[in-house]
Every structure is written in structure tokens, then in C-alpha cells.
From Swiss-Prot:
GO terms for molecular function: pectinesterase activity; pectinesterase inhibitor activity. InterPro entries: Invertase/methylesterase_inhib, Pectin_lyas_fold, Pectin_lyase_fold/virulence, Pectinesterase_Asp_AS, Pectinesterase_cat, Pectinesterase_inhib_dom, Pectinesterase_Tyr_AS. The PMEI region may act as an autoinhibitory domain and prevent untimely PME activity during transport. It is an enzyme of class 3 (hydrolase). SUPFAM superfamilies: Pectin lyase-like, Plant invertase/pectin methylesterase inhibitor. It comes from Solanum lycopersicum. The record marks Q360 as: Transition state stabilizer. This is Pectinesterase 1. Its EC number is 3.1.1.11. SMART domains: PMEI. Residues 40-229 form a propeptide. Pfam families: Pectinesterase (PF01095), PMEI (PF04043). In the N-terminal section; belongs to the PMEI family. In the C-terminal section; belongs to the pectinesterase family. The lineage of its organism: Eukaryota, Viridiplantae, Streptophyta, Embryophyta, Tracheophyta. The active site is at D361, D382.
Amino acid sequence: MANPQQPLLIKTHKQNPIISFKILSFVITLFVALFLVAPYQVEIKHSNLCKTAQDSQLCLSYVSDLISNEIVTTESDGHSILMKFLVNYVHQMNNAIPVVRKMKNQINDIRQHGALTDCLELLDQSVDFASDSIAAIDKRSRSEHANAQSWLSGVLTNHVTCLDELDSFTKAMINGTNLEELISRAKVALAMLASLTTQDEDVFMTVLGKMPSWVSSMDRKLMESSGKDIIANAVVAQDGTGDYQTLAEAVAAAPDKSKTRYVIYVKRGTYKENVEVASNKMNLMIVGDGMYATTITGSLNVVDGSTTFRSATLAAVGQGFILQDICIQNTAGPAKDQAVALRVGADMSVINRCRIDAYQDTLYAHSQRQFYRDSYVTGTVDFIFGNAAVVFQKCQLVARKPGKYQQNMVTAQGRTDPNQATGTSIQFCNIIASSDLEPVLKEFPTYLGRPWKEYSRTVVMESYLGGLINPAGWAEWDGDFALKTLYYGEFMNNGPGAGTSKRVKWPGYHVITDPAKAMPFTVAKLIQGGSWLRSTGVAYVDGLYD
């Protein structure tokens, strides 16, 4: 115990106040210098990592945060920084999920309840995509970078889809999930990956003479066969002669995360049901007796309370999905606005010899790499839309008679960031009018597309364009929105609607004359087809000139 007469603090010698002030000033100056120099050093060292970001300062601030929190060091390379950034990002998305789930349980509005249900599904998918991207980036190869770019493009698309479906009230409520920040971080991740990829070479590997490489030799044989000749794992038949009477039952019974092809054969007939192939239903093939014999039909639509995302008659997000010899339709009609027949968010998916029928928003090519061959798609407004990396070859794209005062738009592509590896490519196809539109072409103009999002990207090449196509070719979405940032191109088309002399004069529109500029939109380039399509057995052309 201290002596009660002894002061608790020992008395020190009195210091010169001028010297003390100088020492204090030096310490403060040193601290400020270090505080200012550290971010500057981060900016200099890692500026290349953020060079393709739309907001490079935001990107650098994220890197600085990782360093400040000792997650990475100033000496860490770009791959390591990106992987740690994504680990943090996955953690943020996982934290957002229970917040959205709680909000969904509290909200009474049917449409917003549905929108939050969609957001939950999309967040779950995004966690998987980002986690898979970390593993792919760690391998440091061009092909794995291409995979990561596709998956991270899907993450950004998922977040934007969620935000698009929410009304202003729900957006305010959901602010606790920092959805806008999740979007910003997805864009930064794509920018970082793009900077690493350009150092290692272009992600789009040219592999000529092959199908998209995600198609195995066994799948190739399956796709060369008809449904009745395939030895299926499960058979669906309305008359009870199969294993199941509905497709939904057969899909539910399919194995989860299958590493081998699982085939469901659907016998001829019309099946009134809505079917979802979830992300855990991998390598699933659904095959019918032909696009005019086996039909899956539904009628969900936005007017009656569904979200666009959930209105699909058939939705598929399980990787490696194949759909063949079947018709998918939504019969809601033009008065019901958005009513999707088929939604696909399955990476490395193939739609072969199928018919997809509806009016507005017929085919939602939502995200990931997709290939459509020898198929027949009908619709009116934005009837092929979404933000997938998708190639159509030898398809019939048929515009129908729309509702009163409507205009037909073949495409509405939804790319929101220049680093997304997404776009719509239409090659060796016929774009024509249906029999009910043909007599009234002058009343209902038809355009090749309009920009749904800021960096919309669509190319039509080596295709037949019927007389239904308006001479302007393309239409605005809203005034001058996206006209400078979109990329719309036409290359070597033919037919009465193919003339380009009266086409729009937008900065983002291009009449392509150099084949090298058309190559990025081929199977080999846009969807890395050389690495996966060959094994499916579906016919395809990987380059130009059929």
C-alpha cells in the first residue's frame, strides 16, 4: 500500500514547453504522413488491379481496407488480393440472407413477397458462384479465368435482378442488406479479374473445329438420338406407363449434384405444370418426343401477381442442363404483359430442337453460358431477354402479332457492366413474321432489339432478316439511355430486312465488315464453346461461315 503522505504520481522535472510542442508537432506530422502515404502506396502498387474498374478509387479503397485489416499485405499479388476480396464478399452475402428471409416473412404484398423469394434464391446461387470462382482463380489458368468471369458475371446479374424486382418501399426496407454495396463489390471483382486476365491473355479461347467443350462424347450421342431411342433414367407419361405422371415429380426425384448425365424422357402429351430444375440438379437432360409432340405449358404472368422471374413455365439453373425435342409455352397472352415460357440460368446449358412459345418475355436467358440450336422461338415484346452469354444457331425467331400499341423487340439484352462476359449472338438464324403478324406488318413495327441495360450487347450475323424488320433496325429503351455504351452489331446478314443504309446512327451501333470483329460473338469465343459443347453431341459451328 502506498504511503498516505506519498503522492500517487512521482513528480517529474519541468520540461521546456517549446521542446514539447516541437516533439508533439513532429509526431502528428509523422502520423499524418504515414496516413496519407499508405493509401498512396496502395494506389501506386495496385493501380493495375483496378485499371478496368468503372470506379477505380472505390476499387482501390476496397484493396486498402483489406490491407488495413491485415487480410492481405502490400506485397500480395493480384490473384491473392482478389481471392481474399471474394472470401469477404461471400461472408457479406451470407450475412444478407437471414435479413432478406426475415423481411420476406414480415411483408404482406404478394408480388413483393415473391420478389424477396427470388432474391433469396439468387443470393444462394451467388454464394455458390463466388465460392467456385475463388477455386477457379486459384488455378491461375486462362480457361479457369473464363469460368470465374462467367460465374462472377452471374453474381452481378443476380443482384441486379433482385433489385429490379423490388418496389421503392421494399428497397428501403432491404437497405440493411447493403444490396447496392453487393452490386458495387461484384463490379469490382469483375474488374480485378479482367485486369489479371489481360495480363495472362484473353479469356476467350479460340478452339476451332469443336463444340462448346462442356459437352461430353456421351452427351453428343444422346443429342443425336430421339427420346424413344434413349435409355432414360426416368420416364414421364400421363397415362401411367412411365415412372412418373408429371415432369416436376421426376425432376424432384433426380439425384442431387450428379456428376453423370441423368436423363428424363417425357412421352408425348400436354403437361400443365410449372417446373423448376434447381441449382442442385446438375447434369440433367429432359427430352421429349418432339417440339410438336411433347408440351409443358403454364400461364403465370405479372398482371396476375407473379414476378417476371417466377413466371417461367420451366426454369433451369442446374449446371449442365440439356433440353431437347420438347415445347415449352406460356399461354398468358399479350394482355398479361411479362409471361416467361423458359428461364435458363444454368451454366453450360444446351437447348436443342425445342419450341419456346409465348408473347412478352418468352425466353429469359438470365445468366451463364447457353447454346440454342435448331430451335423455334416465338414472341412479341423483348421475347429474348436477359444477361447470359448466349449463342443461337440455326434457330427460327418468329415475331407474333402483339397487343394494341405494342412494338415487337426480338432482343433486350441486360449487360450492366463492361467487364461482364455476357451478350446475345444470333448466327445462321431466320428472323421472320408469324402468319398472324404478316398481314399487319405496317401496324406493328419489329426491331432486332433495344438496350435493357447500360452495356447491352447483341450481334446478329450470317442470318436471314425478313421484311418485318424496321429499316432503323434497333429501337431506344428510353431516350438516349445506353446509346453510347451499348454494342449492337450486324455482320453479313441477308434478306429484305438486312439492309443497313437506314439503320440507327448511334455511337454503339456497328456494321461489321471485318470478320475479326465478329469472331468474339461466335461459339468458340463468347461461350468458350470449344471446351464443352463437343461432348453434348449437338451440332454447332464454332466460328464464322457455316
